[in-house]
Regions:
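Signature of Asx- and small-polar-rich beta-strand/turn repeats characteristic
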Residues: 1-87, 91-96, 101, 105-128, ...
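Solvent-exposed, low-complexity segments and loops of surface/extracellular structural proteins
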Residues: 131, 138-144
Length: 205
């Protein structure tokens, strides 16, 4: 730099093209049924409150919105429904689909430990499991008898769409966007979604 023109303490921003000769491809890893609790606080920023039209998921590259639950009470957390299970044969995996032998209900597993939390496929009004069911995991093949079924918070998944955060030239933070015709939630939210975790590297191939 020229001290006469810029002075000795000047800060200069240089914009230019570089050639990187050693680059590594990033790897995506599927992460299923990640949970995000959304509650109102005194200093919450936009995108972090249940009543915001857009709610940030806090990470990029989400690819499926599994479920959104509304506690309908600002003082209590939203919850998924749960199954208390009898003897389990095999090992269930998080995010896999389970099917009820009697009811025909289908759901995604959020937590594999009993009581097993889950999200019904089909959203509000979908057929739920019963105590007559033996559930079977689609990918694991694990089975278990259902001892009891506990209802979760109100399902409001249909009130939102998923913005994956993927843009033409960068990955933005993913978010859920409330539909213009949908009413604002009344309580705290629980959002369940699938996303891709990114490894270290320079680009996606």
């Amino acid at each position: 730099t020229d001290n006469t023109i810029l002075g000795s303490g000047a800060k200069v921003k240089f914009i230019g093209t570089i050639l990187k000769t050693s680059v590594a491809s990033k790897v995506k890893t599927t992460q299923l049924c990640k949970q995000l609790k959304v509650a109102t606080g005194a200093t919450d920023a936009f995108g972090t409150r249940p009543t915001d039209e857009q709610i940030s998921l806090g990470r990029a590259d989400a690819f499926k919105l599994v479920g959104v639950f509304d506690s309908e009470d600002t003082s209590s957390d939203a919850t998924t429904p749960e199954l208390t299970l009898g003897a389990i044969t095999g090992t269930f995996t998080r995010g896999e689909q389970i099917t009820g032998s009697s009811s025909g209900a289908k759901a995604r597993i959020v937590d594999t430990t009993s009581p097993m939390s889950y999200v019904l496929e089909g959203g509000f009004g979908a057929t739920d499991f019963t105590t007559s069911d033996t559930i079977t995991g689609t990918s694991s093949g694990a089975t278990a008898a259902v001892s009891s079924v506990t209802s979760g918070s109100k399902v409001i998944t249909s009130s939102f769409t998923l913005d994956t955060g993927q843009r033409d030239n960068f990955y933005d933070i993913a978010r859920i966007v409330r539909k213009k015709t949908a009413t604002a939630p009344r309580g705290r939210l629980l959002v369940v979604y699938d996303f891709f975790a990114h490894s270290a590297g320079d680009f996606f191939s």
